[in-house]
A protein has these predicted regions:
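Conserved interdomain hinge at the start of the Helicase C-terminal
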Residues: 445, 500-535
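Conserved helicase motor "Helicase C" RecA-like lobe of SF1/SF2 P-loop NTPases
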Residues: 535-559
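Walker A/P-loop
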Residues: 46-68
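Conserved RecA-like P-loop NTPase helicase motor core
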Residues: 500-510, 560-669
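A substrate-engagement module of RecA-like helicase motors
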Residues: 2-19, 23, 28, 58, ...
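Signature of the SF2 helicase/ATPase Hel1-core->accessory helical subdomain module
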Residues: 72, 89-92, 97-100, 188-189, ...
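Walker A/P-loop NTP-binding motif
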Residues: 41-43, 63-77, 97-101
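A contiguous, basic/glycine-rich beta-loop/short-helix subdomain that forms a polymer-engagement track
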Residues: 182-217, 226-235, 365-503, 510-512, ...
């Protein structure tokens, strides 16, 4: 390849597609959108270091920008564009609206495929088994509830056979009862792939076949991370062949942290050891005790016995830790700086050889089942081997997860990369947990060093005007090209940031809750529509309970129904001229699209600082302080600024929107960091009362 991949031909293709799209939409060029297209094209056209970060304010048109820049270039050099989102809502918008619009109006020819995990698809084999064996009593291999879903499962089969349903969870219209879906889906260990009798009709493989040769694949962060964790190229194309676009990229570090966390419950594991012996023993009996299975199940039983003794000792060692109560049902102990005491690390080390042998034994058992499915084992009833792939595969997955946790704790005092480690305890069990506090090193290893190119974008990537926190958490070098593009909206003319006179300190739960309760009736009477955001369920419940009954009964409170149902009811009320007020916590502070009259007022009850007793946040702060840094100003305040911008972003979604954001936390005025938080917001018109 030449030094500069961004040839005049590719530039002309990008510019031509943009002009064609603007003309077809009767749009005028947006400066911010053009700037975003240029930045992405320049980065992806470089000979190396093809990663950039673009913060694009609401109204920029970022989806069109990154598609118009990436697709023509990827097409020319034979790469696949992977558009990854954090939410289903944006994923559906990209697939159903944005990409079809570009195909139709920009003159670009490209194919699109939607990628979802195997667990989102119905498994015909499991569905058929449930219907076939629903009247039988002896089905130990199925892990389902006692509830009879046979009528529902028959309807699923009918619709799939008729072509009125594609076998995908999100396209099933009616709500599914709890437990119904898990009975008819599987994972990669429970799937016999092309050896399955239903392979040609399989919903998952039909969808996966559509990925082959697709120019653009739309996925989500969880699926991309799962693919990368498997080495890349397992579900999606290999990273070296992909240009990734992470939309809603501010979620990427947290998603990575969650994906690569590990945990194990002590009593649950002891019970699981018994389950291993039950499953393998029953399978061995089912196939008339062939010698190879008898040997494996006997060896595995020996390992579970020895491991059970170690886990019992581990339970005793953990029980003497100085736990602190977190709520009425749970206690927690966090290891300072993630250092595991030698006595506990030694027990985990002692368990490693046996756990490795257990993993190997279950894996070999699973391999023999696969051989039987392929017709390579002369067992009695070998035709039933496929039925056992899922339960044995689930044992295999849990064994590997437990091994990873033990390895983490065994190395807890000597690892290169820092982890938060803590113990949860309730009256039933003790849980060991570990989570990376530097997810960036994982992303660097599995993504940044391997991918052909990548664009990270969102409306909220800077904190207090700097990309430093995002780059640090994501594992990107400080010199990564990073651009912030302002929203085209005229905020001073259309939006007000209001801080009323407040008496209470938000850190005084009772006093602040009482004052919020007194202020809300008047605040909510000012507009027909409002979104009220709390930082904790505890305060939300306390305030809603204390509000006047006539007001409280009309609120649409998160948790009283599904998110979709609440929003639908909210829209119905506004459409019919009624008042409607949504009330929720952090998950309502982003991802809600309530344009126009659907949201004229956002009330933020408290500054969105992280929960002070979260073990991961505590560990991050502890490490920062150990390095001589100020954790509050370097971590807590920037993170709160980012969340505050996201919450305020619920107000203005389109250029004709207007309204008010009200902040019921006087610290934004009285504390030293308050001015920095205000300056990080869009340029609202400020209405700040004198604060006591």
């Amino acid at each position: 390849m030449s030094q500069d991949l961004l040839t005049e031909q590719i530039k002309d293709a990008i510019q031509g597609a943009y002009r064609t799209w603007l003309s077809a939409r009767d749009f005028k060029p947006r400066r911010g959108q053009r700037e975003m297209i240029a930045q992405i094209a320049r980065t992806l056209g470089q000979a190396e270091s093809r990663v950039c970060v673009v913060e694009a304010g609401t109204g920029t048109g970022k989806t069109a920008a990154y598609c118009l820049a990436a697709i023509p270039l990827a097409s020319t050099i034979g790469k696949t564009v992977i558009v990854s989102t954090a939410t289903v809502a944006l994923q559906e918008q990209v697939v159903l609206q944005d990409l079809p619009d570009l195909k139709q109006r920009a003159g670009l020819a490209f194919s699109v495929s939607l990628a979802k995990g195997r667990g989102r698809y119905m498994c015909l084999k499991r569905l058929d088994d449930h219907l076939k064996y629903q009247d039988q009593q002896e089905i130990p291999i199925f892990d389902v509830s006692n509830e009879d879903f046979s009528v529902l499962y028959q309807e699923m089969l009918n619709r799939y056979s008729q072509g009125s349903w594609d076998g995908e969870l999100d396209s099933w219209v009616e709500p599914l009862p709890d437990g119904a879906w898990t009975g008819v889906t599987t994972d990669h260990r429970g799937c016999s792939n092309n050896r399955c009798s239903f392979f040609k009709q399989c919903a998952f493989f039909r969808a996966r076949n559509n990925l082959e040769g697709a120019d653009v694949i739309v996925a989500n962060h969880d699926l991309v991370l799962a693919d990368l964790a498997l080495g890349g190229g397992a579900v999606l194309p290999a990273p070296e062949d992909c240009i990734y676009v992470f939309d809603e990229a501010h979620h990427l570090a947290d998603k990575t942290q969650n994906h690569f966390a590990s945990s194990a419950r002590i009593q649950g594991t002891l019970q699981w050891f018994d389950n291993i012996n039950n499953v393998l023993g029953t399978a061995t009996q089912r196939f008339a005790r062939p010698a190879n299975l008898v040997g494996l199940s006997t060896n595995v039983a020996s390992e579970t016995t020895a491991l059970g003794d170690i886990f019992t000792d581990l339970s005793q060692a953990l029980s003497i830790l100085p736990f602190e109560p977190r709520d009425e049902e749970r206690e927690l102990y966090r290891f300072p700086l993630g250092d595991v005491p030698v006595s506990i690390a030694e027990l985990c080390t002692a368990a490693l050889p046996g756990m490795q042998r257990l993993c190997d034994g279950i894996e070999r058992f699973h391999e023999l089942l696969s051989d039987a499915v392929a017709g390579n084992q002369d067992w009695e009833k070998a035709f039933e081997a496929e039925d056992w792939l899922l339960p044995v595969g689930q044992l295999q997955g849990r064994a590997l997860a437990t091994l990873n946790l033990l390895q983490d704790y065994a190395q807890g005092v000597e690892q290169d990369h820092r982890c938060a480690r803590w113990i949860n305890r309730n009256q039933y069990d003790v849980e060991m947990v570990s989570a990376p506090i530097e997810p960036g090193h994982i992303l660097s290893e599995v993504l940044w060093q391997r991918c052909y190119g990548c664009v990270c974008t969102s409306a909220t990537l800077t904190a207090l005007g700097s990309f430093q926190r995002f780059l640090e958490r994501s594992g990107l070098p400080p010199d990564t090209p990073a651009t912030s593009i302002a929203s085209p909206f005229n905020y001073p003319e259309i939006a007000t940031f209001h801080v009323p006179s407040m008496q209470s300190d938000p850190r005084d739960f009772d006093a602040h809750s009482d004052e919020v309760t007194r202020l809300l009736p008047d605040l909510l009477s000012r507009e027909r529509s409002a979104l009220v955001l709390f930082t904790s369920w505890r305060q939300l419940n306390a305030v809603v309970k204390a509000l006047p009954e006539d007001l409280a009964e009309g609120l649409l409170v998160q948790g009283d129904g599904s998110k979709q149902a609440l929003i639908a009811e909210h829209r119905r009320r506004i459409d019919e001229g009624e008042a409607s007020h949504l009330v929720g916590v952090a998950s309502f502070s982003e991802g809600l699209d309530l344009p126009g009259d659907y949201c004229r007022h956002v009330v933020i009850v408290k500054l969105p600082f992280a929960v002070p007793d979260d073990p991961i946040d505590q560990a991050i702060a502890e490490w920062a302080e150990a390095q001589g840094r100020n954790a509050f100003y370097e971590i807590s305040v920037p993170d709160a600024a980012l969340k505050l911008v996201q919450a305020c972003g619920r107000l203005i979604r389109h250029e004709r929107d207007y309204g008010t954001v009200t902040m019921l936390d006087k610290r934004i005025v009285t504390q030293r960091y308050g001015r920095a938080l205000i300056e990080s917001l869009p340029p609202f018109r400020l209405d700040i009362a004198s604060v006591s």
